[in-house]
Structure formats: C-alpha cells, structure tokens
Amino acid sequence: MASGETVPGRSKGIGVCAVDAVSGRITCSAMLPSTPNPSHLTMSTDRRFLYCVSELKEFSGISGSTVSAYAVEEGGARLRLLSRQATCGADACFVRLWHNEKWLLAANYSGGSVAVFPVEADHGLGPAACVLRHSGCGTDMRRQEGPHPHQILPAPDKIHVYVPDLGLDRLVCYRFDEEAGWLTKDGWQDIPGLPGQGIRHGVFRADGTRLYVMTEMAAQVNVYSYDPADGSAALLQTCDTVRGTAGKLGAAIRLHPSGKWLYASVRGADVLVTFGVDENGLLTEQSRIGSGGKIPRDFDLTPDGRFLLAANQDSDNLCVFEIDAEGNPHP
C-alpha cells in the first residue's frame, strides 16, 4: 500500500506499506521522498507502475500541479521516475488510469479542469493530449464560486466518464475517445446533485444500475438509478452520514466487494459510516464508528473485503478495521 500527503503536507513523500492478509497488520517498509507534496495516486494492474499527482499551486515556476509516473522496483522499496508532466491546473486531487491503461486522467480542483495524458511505451506519461475547463458556479459562494472537479469516474459502458464537480453540484459527463485521448460532450446528460451539497466522489454498483455519490458540504450520500445504455439517472434516496451540523465534511465512499454494504467517511465528525444495501440498491444506516484519528480523508477495502484501511490526515495515521460477517468494521 502506498499513501501520500495532502496540502498542507507534513510527511516526506510516498509511504510504502504491506498489509498482512490474515491479521490485517500494517508494516511500513519505506518512505520515498521523490514526489513534491503527493496527493492521490493509482497503480497499473500489474502493480509495476505508479502514477501520482502533486497537489500544488505551482511547480518550478510553472503555474499548476504535476503528475508523475514511476516504475516500482525492489519490491516497492524504490521508485524510479519515468516522467513528470504539468496537469495544466492547480491543486490536482485525483488521478485514474483508463481501463486499457493507455491513458491517464487527472482532476484539477482549483484549476477547474480535467486533463488526459497518454501512457507511453515505457509507461511514462506524455504531455496532456486534452484539457477541458469547466465553467459555472454553485449556490454557496464560499465554496462554490467556480468549478472544482474532484474525481474521475468511468461509466459502466467504458466509453463515457463522469467528473464529480463540487463547485457545480453535478457529475459532468463526457464521451472519451480512447484512440485520440479526447473528451467530448455527446448528448449524454450530466447528473445533478441537490443545491449546495458539494458533490465529491461516486461509485457504481457492479451491475451498473445504481450510482452512489458522496457529497462533501452536506455530508450526504445520494443514491441514483442508472441506465448503462443511455446514461439516464434519477435520484432515489439521500442519506445523512452525520447528525446535526457539526463535523459535516464528507470524504470517501466505497462499496464492499460483495455489494452488500456501502461505507462513507466523514471529516470533522471523524467517523466511518456503514450502510446496508438492499436488493433494490437502497441504503439503511447500519453502524458508525470512529475512524481512529482525525480527518479520515480516504479509506479503502482489501480485495477480499476482510479489512478496511482508513487514512487520517491530521493525526498522520493509518488504522485497520476488520469487517465482520454483518459488514460492520471493528478496530
């Protein structure tokens, strides 16, 4: 497992950790100080290459963030830089490989843009092939004065891609041309949230018929019906993750591999919330537990669904939770 820091960062770079598949114990083996202020990262399917955005306002005198490509060597103990490219926007916060791993897409939060990079023969990155800037604003001028793309979410058809935009309260839809690396609008509709929710991240159910969206400002989860054939969506349900107004800063969202449970993290309240998923894809809150630290910015599940690993930003710690037979995490 590799983890990076976020603005304002206090660590030295990318940490490399191993998770014991039986006990869930984490062993951190290396800290690789080769990336300036690393934020979000992703790896190739074969785990031999790593891609990481640096959440920056400028780098080496050039406005905007960067994205770096590395070869993973010596069992993860060493990263060899293959290339570094400008993301053409400030505060890059998310990066994802396209399903064929020939393209990499990045979201620039403050830059209000999305960039597409070709993955070259050596698995490094070429300069951006496409950069699209969103326009508009939301209802809350403190947080939504302009567009703030926050994630890259491929649609189930592997042709379209959604970009959840906190500033616009919608998931912006594009068609992706995987031959040319271009994003275009083609008639598929954006998916709106509710005014002032601050859409952050989303996840599709395995069959593609339900979409779950975490909102940052409202700390709510929206459930949509979704038609993979034409991208049409309808809001079915909105679930609160916190009670009252304190600690209302939604963060990450994940579905259990079984599809039976959905998890959400909330910063400020510093909790992990578990929802049961019924046969219609609707949610019922099942449990909530402290994240084991402050500001659980992200978390993930092991591939077998046995453990949940939470990354607490302000307390600088990783916490492991074992998931019981009912889907509830326990430290």
Across the structure, where does each feature detected by a protein language model lie?
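A short beta-strand motif characteristic of beta-propeller blades
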Residues: 27-33, 80-85, 130, 136-142, ...
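Structural preference for solvent-exposed beta-strand-turn elements
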Residues: 85, 94-177, 192, 269, ...
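Loop-centered beta-sheet repeat module
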Residues: 158-219
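Residue position within the beta-strands of beta-propeller blades
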Residues: 1, 51-53, 106, 163, ...
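Blade-loop segments of beta-propeller domains
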Residues: 27-101
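Short glycine/acidic-enriched loop and turn motifs that connect beta-strands
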Residues: 4-8, 55-61, 110-113, 168-170, ...
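Beta-rich, blade/repeat-based domains predominating
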Residues: 10, 35-45, 88-99, 103, ...
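Short loop/turn segments immediately following beta-strands, especially the blade-tip
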Residues: 17-24, 70-77, 116-126, 174-183, ...
